[in-house]
């Protein structure tokens, strides 16, 4: 919104220091985006055109005799609207207009001693085409008086950015209220007009569901010529039009904040009614003819009569916004500027707008009418401690009361003798944004100053609000992303499958009483008990489509024989690990341990143990149980060659894991050694039926000092019942670099345990 300092002086005496005023307004939350001086140049004075004669050598030029007080100057002018008896701004010799210095000159053979100026040439917004015509609205016109001695020509124009909740400041009066409250200067109210109304000229009726409040003045003997001071105010705000009545209406709305309208009348008495139209929008009807939609669209009045009906209206901004949102007719004509003001909250004191407009029209008021409507007071009660808690700053009771009273609030102490004291505050009806105690605290903070708040660290104790379902979801999403990073493609299958195929591959099936009673098809006649069957089908489809390297991942529900649901993860690889490309011209095939390593990158480290029972799908020598946290969580295996041949697949491997048995690693800090580690490789002769997992567990349980890790390296046949197992012992300390004696001591203790537990000995 734009307004001038001269506009503000209508309601309040503004301080002389304009820069300080802009700074203070911004502190109050009314951010001043720009402050532009609008001051007429020096040596531009008030003149009066005495005579106008055509130029003898130019059709479009006129030779004017202009009285500037001390003398009469001959000035050549090219404006079409120049005429005798006009008061005009005259730039004398030496005046700087823009970048041009005015001097005596000769135009087409005729001397010219000055320049008659337009508003643009003076540095003001455009008022009209041609020269600027002065009138008494800017002050008493004295010939020869400097133009910048008149207030409208010596001012500053402020552009103020408002937040949507401050509709009360979308007017000159609203900004003046803030200045009055901050500087403790009196506010000049809009004067009420004294008149004796006639009766019977207007009949006003309003429907039962009408929420808007409307007030009317019937006037006559009005003056509809827009004076210069109004033109300047509207031009500064980019609201000046060629319609004089619209200019007066816009000027009154801009100054008072009341939504104004006017109707031209041909006859009186009249039947005035307010009711909902076909779009359920409140509208005004005169003699049963629709004339406007309240707060949304006003008709432009062109053919003006002697009598005018002035209208002031107020609509609750929330109610209006809801109606606009629910409006089904998207083609309805709307006035966006009108909606902008109405939806942010206009001034509900309708008499302010009517009195202001009538006074500037210099009209005679014949009658007044208004709808029955009363705004409910918004009362808030609070303790001083509440304000202190919100702001973190203790403000004296007297200061709080003073700030709120200056802003138009009614403040009283409820139960003065009670402790703590309770304040009761009634918000003014034009403050639509005041609804809670936090809003009251914000008003106090605006005037106390946010810079005066004491910075304090926030004291906050955060409790862990963990959602186990979300944590589970994120865990499996992370597993999926890891699988994708390892080259697996996610697949999804139905939970239904063929019972016969599952039995053929050696998977359990549902007990007969628990089978599906009405299967979709014979191919989907049971609930799946494994993800592997679907993965095999997907692998075959991809092979038939020409893919030679297939890696699939699936998470889904399976069911045991008791029809209990279990969440599992399935992995399947088929074909080549690396496609045919240099240096692997024939590609690189998968092997059991490469696949196991790939799965471990997804689910974490695990160990393997030999399967005790075999199924038709598993290779008898390349299958194992997956152990994690000393618990069996799944199976990993190469698919039996017979199954590969029957299904016409590439050589394939699979892993199926119980999803909820997977370990979820916590973020734990573990120390690491900054000292070098020592490595000792040992080849042990042990019984061929001894599992490495047993060896590892025995050494771990013994807690041999400095022995941090034992790894299997190689295995080969030694004799009928024994094998040679090569293992690596990693030895290091967190405290120091170990010497040979300490390293050998750890190795010797390990050998003693292995000999005792497994009858193992070093190979000679």
Curated annotation (Swiss-Prot):
HAMAP family: Phe_tRNA_synth_beta1. Mg(2+) binds at residues 433, 439, 442-443. Belongs to the phenylalanyl-tRNA synthetase beta subunit family. Type 1 subfamily. The keyword Protein biosynthesis applies. Its EC number is 6.1.1.20. Its main location: cytoplasm. Keywords: Aminoacyl-tRNA synthetase, ATP-binding, Cytoplasm, Ligase, Magnesium, Metal-binding, Nucleotide-binding, Protein biosynthesis, RNA-binding, tRNA-binding. Transmembrane segments: none annotated. Binds 2 magnesium ions per tetramer. It comes from Helicobacter pylori (strain ATCC 700392 / 26695) (Campylobacter pylori). This is Phenylalanine--tRNA ligase beta subunit. Signal peptide: none annotated. Residues 38-148 form the tRNA-binding domain. The keyword Transferase does not apply. It holds the Pfam family B5. GO terms for biological process: phenylalanyl-tRNA aminoacylation. GO terms for molecular function: ATP binding; magnesium ion binding; phenylalanine-tRNA ligase activity; tRNA binding. Residues 375-455 form the B5 domain. Its cofactor is Mg(2+). It catalyses: tRNA(Phe) + L-phenylalanine + ATP = L-phenylalanyl-tRNA(Phe) + AMP + diphosphate + H(+). Residues 673-763 form the FDX-ACB domain. GO terms for cellular component: phenylalanine-tRNA ligase complex. It is found in: Cytoplasm. Tetramer of two alpha and two beta subunits. PANTHER family: PHENYLALANINE--TRNA LIGASE BETA SUBUNIT, PHENYLALANYL-TRNA SYNTHETASE BETA CHAIN AND LEUCINE-RICH REPEAT-CONTAINING PROTEIN 47.
């Amino acid at each position: 919104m734009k307004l001038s300092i001269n506009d503000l002086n209508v309601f309040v005496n503004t301080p002389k220091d304009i820069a300080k005023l802009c700074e203070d307004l911004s502190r109050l939350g009314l951010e001043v985006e720009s402050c532009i001086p609008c001051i007429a140049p020096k040596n531009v004075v008030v003149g009066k055109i005495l005579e106008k004669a055509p130029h003898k050598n130019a059709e479009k030029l006129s030779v004017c005799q202009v009285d500037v007080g001390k003398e009469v100057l001959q000035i050549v002018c090219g404006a079409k609207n120049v005429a005798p008896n006009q008061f005009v701004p005259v730039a004398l010799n030496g005046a700087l207009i823009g970048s041009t210095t005015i001097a005596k000159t000769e135009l087409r053979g005729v001397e010219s001693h000055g320049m008659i100026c337009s508003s643009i040439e003076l540095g003001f917004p455009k008022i009209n085409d041609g020269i600027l015509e002065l009138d008494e609205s800017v002050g008493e016109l004295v010939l020869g008086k400097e133009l910048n001695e008149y207030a409208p020509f010596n001012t500053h124009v402020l552009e103020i950015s408002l937040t949507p909740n401050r509709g009360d400041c979308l007017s000159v009066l609203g900004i003046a209220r803030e200045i009055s409250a901050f500087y403790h200067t009196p506010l000049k109210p809009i004067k009420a007009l004294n008149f004796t109304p006639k009766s019977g000229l207007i009949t006003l009726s309003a429907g039962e569901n009408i929420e808007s409040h409307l007030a009317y003045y019937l006037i006559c003997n009005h003056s509809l010529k827009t004076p210069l001071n109004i033109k300047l105010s509207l031009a500064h705000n980019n609201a000046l039009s060629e319609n004089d009545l619209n200019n007066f209406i816009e000027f009154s709305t801009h100054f008072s904040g009341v939504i104004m309208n006017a109707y031209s009348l041909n006859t009186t008495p009249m039947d005035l009614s307010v009711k909902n139209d076909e779009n359920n929008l409140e509208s005004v009807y005169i003699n049963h003819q629709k004339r406007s939609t309240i707060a949304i669209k006003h008709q432009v009045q062109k053919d003006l009569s002697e009598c005018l009906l002035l209208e002031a209206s107020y609509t609750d901004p929330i109610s209006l916004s809801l109606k606009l949102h629910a409006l089904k007719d998207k083609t309805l004509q709307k006035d966006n500027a009108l909606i902008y003001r109405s939806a942010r909250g206009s001034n509900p004191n309708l008499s302010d707008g009517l009195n202001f407009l009538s006074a500037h029209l210099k009209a005679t008021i014949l009658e007044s009418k208004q709808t029955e409507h009363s705004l409910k007071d918004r009362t808030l009660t609070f303790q001083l401690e509440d304000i202190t808690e919100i702001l973190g700053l203790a403000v004296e009771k007297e200061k709080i009361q003073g700030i709120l009273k200056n802003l138009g609030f009614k403040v009283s102490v409820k139960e003065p003798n009670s402790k703590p004291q309770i304040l009761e505050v009634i918000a003014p009806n034009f403050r639509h944004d005041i609804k809670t105690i936090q809003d009251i605290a914000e008003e106090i903070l605006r005037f106390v100053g946010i810079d005066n708040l004491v910075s304090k660290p926030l004291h906050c104790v955060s409790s862990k609000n963990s959602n186990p379902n979300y944590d589970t979801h994120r865990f499996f999403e992370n597993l999926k992303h890891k699988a994708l990073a390892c080259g697996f493609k996610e697949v999804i299958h139905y939970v239904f499958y063929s019972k016969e195929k599952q039995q053929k591959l050696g998977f359990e099936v549902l007990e007969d009483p628990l089978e599906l009673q009405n299967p979709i098809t014979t191919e989907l006649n049971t609930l799946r008990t494994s993800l592997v069957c679907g993965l095999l089908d997907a692998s075959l489809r991809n092979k038939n489509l020409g893919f030679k390297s297939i890696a699939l991942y699936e998470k889904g529900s399976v069911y045991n024989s008791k029809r209990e649901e279990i969440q599992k993860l399935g992995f399947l690889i088929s074909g080549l690990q690396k496609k045919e490309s240099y240096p692997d011209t024939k590609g690189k095939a998968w092997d059991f341990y490469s696949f196991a390593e790939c799965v471990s990158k997804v689910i974490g480290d695990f160990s393997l143990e030999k399967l005790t029972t075999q199924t038709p799908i598993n290779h008898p020598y390349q299958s194992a149980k997956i152990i994690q946290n000393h618990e069996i969580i799944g199976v990993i295996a190469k698919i039996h060659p017979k199954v590969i041949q029957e299904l016409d697949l590439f050589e394939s491997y699979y892993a199926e894991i119980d999803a909820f048995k997977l370990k979820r690693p916590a973020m734990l800090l573990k120390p690491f050694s900054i000292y070098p580690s020592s490595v000792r490789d040992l080849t042990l002769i042990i019984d061929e039926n001894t599992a490495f997992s047993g060896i590892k567990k025995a050494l771990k349980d013994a807690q041999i000092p400095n022995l941090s890790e034992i790894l299997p390296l190689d295995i080969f046949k030694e004799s009928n019942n024994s094998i040679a197992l090569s293992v690596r012992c990693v030895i290091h300390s967190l405290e120091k670099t170990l010497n040979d004696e300490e390293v050998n001591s750890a190795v010797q203790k390990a050998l003693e345990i292995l000999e005792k537990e497994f009858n193992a000995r070093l190979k000679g």
